[in-house]
Design a protein with these regions (language model features):
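Small/polar loops that bind or transfer phosphate-bearing groups
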Residues: 25-28, 77, 126, 194
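Active-site HxH/HxHxD metal-binding segment of metal-dependent hydrolases
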Residues: 30-34, 38-121, 207-214
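Metallo-beta-lactamase
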Residues: 31, 92, 128-215
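Glycine-rich phosphate-binding loop signature in dinucleotide/nucleotide-binding domains
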Residues: 40-46, 122-127, 146-148, 186
Length: 215
């Protein structure tokens, strides 16, 4: 099953949970007033792995504490994106804190950090996630495709009726089309779990999302 936590700053976190209540957490978002951790307690799950779609602060803000609570959990991020975890300029936490968010970002890399690349398969908690690199929002942005669950975790690559911006550090419009084409070629019937906003499905986006439709 897939469970969703909507953080108060607007970023989404997702839990893919097996029958043993083991969970793969996708994007440990900002946890204002302990909201994310209260949600984990309510779910009564053990976090065994963390998948990061990209390294902006609103998608990794709770990573340090999650790693303390679940020290054996594997952390997956694309090879090109790993430096974002501790770089306050790349992950935009410096700018966020100047606006008063109070974000605590990792000052060290997690012990069980695993760097992945395009088409790699991540096997955790009985699930198989295929890595789809989609660089343009950031240079190492990735989506995670869970074929058996017909689910796509798209981070800030694909949203309901639109796509992510490309004007932030390391972002580029040059690779947008090739990145989105990878998603457009995926099978029909996929539910899309984006990094912000409402969930959607790939069939709808192929039909109505201008960025996908025109590729």
């Amino acid at each position: 099953m897939v469970d969703i936590y909507y953080s108060r700053d607007g970023a989404n976190s997702f839990f893919v949970i097996n029958e043993k209540r083991e969970a793969v957490l996708i994007d440990p978002s900002f946890s204002e007033h302990r909201g994310l951790f209260d949600h984990i307690n309510k779910l009564n799950v053990k976090i065994v792995a963390i998948l990061i779609t990209h390294g902006h602060w609103d998608h990794i803000a709770s990573l340090e504490e999650i790693c303390h609570l679940y020290p054996e959990a594997h952390v997956y991020i694309s090879d090109d994106e790993a430096e974002f975890l501790t770089n306050v300029d790349l992950n935009l936490s410096k700018a966020a804190n100047e606006e008063g968010y109070g974000v605590n970002i990792l000052t060290y890399l997690p012990i069980h950090l695993l760097k992945v690349n395009d088409r790699d398969i991540i096997e955790e908690a009985g699930f198989k996630f295929k890595v789809i690199l989609t660089p343009f929002h950031t240079k190492g942005s990735a989506c995670f495709y869970l074929e058996n669950e017909k689910a796509l975790f798209s981070g800030d690559t694909l949203f309901f009726s639109t796509v992510g911006r490309s004007d932030l550090p390391t972002g580029t419009v040059k690779t947008m089309e090739s990145s989105l084409k990878k998603l457009k070629e995926l099978p029909v019937g996929l539910k899309v779990y984006p990094g912000h906003g409402a969930c959607t499905n790939l069939d709808r986006e192929k039909k109505y999302n201008t960025y996908l439709k025109n590729i």
